[in-house]
Amino acid sequence: MRVVLFGKNGQLGFEFEKLLKSRCELLALGRADEGGDLNDLKGLVTRLHSFSPDVVINAAAYTAVDLAQTHEQEARQINALAPSEMAAYCSQTGALLVHFSTDYVFSGNGSDPWTEEELCNPQNVYGQTKFEGEQLIKQAGCKHLIFRTSWVYGEHGKNFMKTILRLAQTKESLNVVDDQVGAPTSAPFLAKHAHEMIRILQSGREDLCGIYHLVPDGEVSWCGFARWIVQNAKNFGAELRLEPTSIRSISTEKYPTPAIRPLNSRLSNAKIKSVLGTESFQSWDQEASDVLYKLVF
């Protein structure tokens, strides 16, 4: 199997490269590599045709949620137009496109987990561009797997877990929102289960193409996640100035940001668990423990 991976230097791409480099003929591309800059659509398409992959994995994205509010064209280029070109290639050649999307395609209303079939209504530019990317991929008519996920973190790259660990070294108190609820999702978890789905489709189950919500089991608020990070880092032996009890909960209303954040980021993972033949995934905190341990040590 020949695979092109875009976004090799991001937290998800990093995990995919580790997972796949000994399992297939892999071309992993970062922004500085020929064909790896998603702002250069012509170069991207040329690289795809020269390598002729069976699978295209797009682990690249414009994820600066607040910055996207004032850089809409740049966000759209990366999150919608580049995936559209990948989808066009896959439609022409029969390759499989694997793409990652977000809980931000939903409005954030209510408290029930969002299913794959529910109406999308993104509330910020980032969510709008990610939703447009989904639509363009589907319109291309290619074989595709689109994985919506939430609150991604990992050993590599910038993320909430690493930010909290850094702040906890010097801060004596911290305010974190407690009315946004979702499932923190580790990059290794995403790479592992996405790879399982790729193998299933490549075995002939093209009827399983489509959108899947890929998150671990359970839910937590950002404030609860922050407290969990600090407490468990201390349990692992990290010397931190910040105590979990000194992390104060505040409402989203009292922490205004340029981009609206959804309060309900819960995603139902029932569909993908059914396809994979499992009744449960690991809980978000079990997944987080594995990554946190590596970051602390």
Region locations from a protein language model:
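N-terminal Rossmann NAD(P)H-binding glycine-rich loop of SDR-like oxidoreductase domains
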Residues: 3-21
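SDR active-site strand-loop-helix element
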Residues: 6, 29, 59-60, 97-102, ...
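NAD(P)H-binding glycine-rich loop region in Rossmannoid oxidoreductase-like domains
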Residues: 38-78
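NAD(P)-cofactor binding segment of oxidoreductase domains
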Residues: 70-98
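Catalytic helix-loop patch of NAD(P)-dependent Rossmann-fold dehydrogenases
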Residues: 77, 82-85, 105-147, 151-152
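NAD(P)-dependent short-chain dehydrogenase/reductase
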Residues: 135-183, 187-196
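Mid/C-terminal beta-alpha module of Rossmann-like enzyme folds, strongest
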Residues: 193, 200-256
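Amphipathic terminal alpha-helices
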Residues: 282-297
